[in-house]
Every structure is written in structure tokens, then in C-alpha cells.
Amino acid sequence: MILHTANFFISDRRSFLGQDTPESVPSVSKMPERGYSVTGLDPDRTVKCAGRELRISPKASVELCRTIRGMKLPEAKKLLERVIEKKVAVAYRHYHKEVPHRRNLTEPFYAGRYPQKAAGRLLRLLEELEANAEYRNLDTERLKIIHAAAQRANKIPKRNPRAFGRSDLLQGTTTHIELVGFEAE
């Protein structure tokens, strides 16, 4: 008899040796439970959404999240639409090495960029947050973004073909983004 997985082999071997107790049988591993990095929220007046492993720049996402944190939802959506149109630049306060100076920044600082791809994905997440608020009967005009966080996620291995049959290993970056809105009075 051929056994295909290691769990069957272990369980059959233990039963053969007379060790088949519930604590000795290996448990099936679960998927990880991904929570939010903010706690202590009022469940009746808050709404959450998250984007996991998005193919956008973590640096641009951190700067965008820092910019929209504390804004009302319609104001944040307008700002992101203007960033996509290249009308307003996002100030890069943390990742500002070799970043050019911009005149039309979101706040008083010298370095900034127009992170269009990250702004587009964040705009989609804001629309999801708005849909979640409408589903929970919250007023979207009074919804304030109290938590916006971006973290680096897993790397995606990629190959770049080179001459003579060789290839270089590249790593694509992904980002986790969390948004929490609170219905202000």
C-alpha cells in the first residue's frame, strides 16, 4: 500500500505502534488570521477595509496613507483623484532621498512625487470603505479616516531573461494597506 502524504504515514505508523491518541495525531494547519494593526474601536461607528499584497510601491503607499490620515472621506477621494491627474504632488517626508522638489505639494515640504499607481489602488480601497459604510448605514459624508497604514508584504520572485540563456532574479514588492473610518459627530 502506497501512502501519498506524510500525515497518513505518521498516523498509520502511530496506530501500528499503538500510540494513536488524539494529542499525538498532527493537527491540520489553518490559514493565518490577518487582523488590523489598530485596536479598541467602536464597532457601531467604525468601518474597516484592507488590501492585501497589492502590487504597488510600499514607499509611495506609506506617504499616501500619511497624507490622507485624518481627512474626511470625500476630501481624501478628491485629493487622490488630483494626484492621479498630476495636479497635486504628495509630499515625501520619510522617503525623500533624491526626490525632486515640487511646487504644488499637499503640505509644506520640498520633496514630492505623483504616485499614480498607488493613488489609484488607494482610491479603490476608499470606495470599498465607502461601500462598507453604506452597508452598515453610516453617513459617508461624515466619515473620517482615523487609521491608514501601509506595510511591506511578501516579495514576488521574477526572472529577467538575459543573453546566452541566463536570467537574473528580480523581486517584485507588494504592500498591505489598512483603512479604518469613523463616523464623526
Features from the language model and the residues they span:
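Generic beta-structure capping elements
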Residues: 39, 148, 182-184
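Short glycine- and Lys/Arg-enriched binding-loop motifs that mark or flank ligand-binding interfaces
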Residues: 14, 66, 161
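Extended, charged amphipathic interaction segments
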Residues: 140-163
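Ribosome large-subunit tunnel/peptidyl-transferase-proximal elements
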Residues: 30-139, 180
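C-terminal edge-of-domain segments
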Residues: 165-185
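N-terminal amphipathic/basic-hydrophobic helices that include classical n-h-c signal peptides
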Residues: 1-30
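Short, solvent-exposed beta-edge and connector elements
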Residues: 56, 163-164
